[in-house]
């Protein structure tokens, strides 16, 4: 029961709905795909990709997959700890922290991921392929690779002061 409660306060965003077809002997069979992201606004994000014969069913499937596929990202007061790069297949993304009041300067699929993650100030750019699925995967990969100064200090056996200089 506790699991149901935590899932109800997640932000959900639909990124893309696409009609796809399968060609069979009798003609084409159309179905729909949906790409969604979910997040708690506090560093937990997940994405899902669902496919069904009807749009609502595809969206529902992708939301369920997104809730099952969540990762935690270390945030620094609504922005990133440091500049990060992420890549997935042909998509490359670059994200850097921004000062308070900057907002989310990012395009398309990347903006949705950053919004549901709870990042409020960031400068971001997508290079190469802008296929939404690949951009979402690259963004999540980049955010997952980000470490807080505390995490780096613990790994190196140093104090946070020594890490930050």
From Swiss-Prot:
With S4 and S12 plays an important role in translational accuracy. Located at the back of the 30S subunit body where it stabilizes the conformation of the head with respect to the body. NCBIfam families: rpsE_bact (TIGR01021). This is Small ribosomal subunit protein uS5. One of its GO terms (cellular component) is small ribosomal subunit. The keyword Repeat does not apply. Residues 10-73 form the S5 DRBM domain. HAMAP family: Ribosomal_uS5_B. Part of the 30S ribosomal subunit. Contacts proteins S4 and S8. Keywords: Ribonucleoprotein, Ribosomal protein, RNA-binding, rRNA-binding. SUPFAM superfamilies: dsRNA-binding domain-like, Ribosomal protein S5 domain 2-like. The N-terminal domain interacts with the head of the 30S subunit; the C-terminal domain interacts with the body and contacts protein S4. The interaction surface between S4 and S5 is involved in control of translational fidelity. One of its GO terms (molecular function) is rRNA binding. It comes from the Bacteria. Belongs to the universal ribosomal protein uS5 family. Pfam families: Ribosomal_S5, Ribosomal_S5_C. GO terms for biological process: translation. The keyword S-adenosyl-L-methionine does not apply. It comes from Photobacterium profundum (strain SS9). The gene is rpsE.
């Amino acid at each position: 029961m506790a699991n149901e409660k935590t899932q109800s306060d997640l932000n959900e965003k639909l990124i893309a709905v696409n009609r796809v077809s399968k060609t069979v002997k009798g003609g084409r069979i159309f179905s729909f795909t949906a790409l969604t992201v979910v997040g708690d606004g506090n560093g937990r994000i997940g994405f899902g990709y669902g496919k069904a014969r009807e749009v609502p069913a595809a969206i529902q499937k992708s939301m369920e997959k997104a809730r099952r596929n969540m990762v935690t990202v270390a945030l620094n007061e609504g922005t990133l700890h440091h500049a990060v790069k992420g890549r997935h297949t042909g998509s490359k993304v670059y994200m850097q922290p921004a000062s308070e009041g900057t907002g989310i300067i990012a395009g398309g699929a990347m903006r949705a991921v950053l919004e549901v993650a709870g990042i409020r100030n960031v400068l971001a750019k997508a290079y190469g392929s802008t296929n939404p699925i690949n951009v979402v995967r690259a963004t999540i990969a980049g955010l997952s690779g980000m470490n807080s100064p505390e995490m780096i200090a613990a790994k190196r056996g140093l104090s946070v002061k020594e890490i930050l200089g």
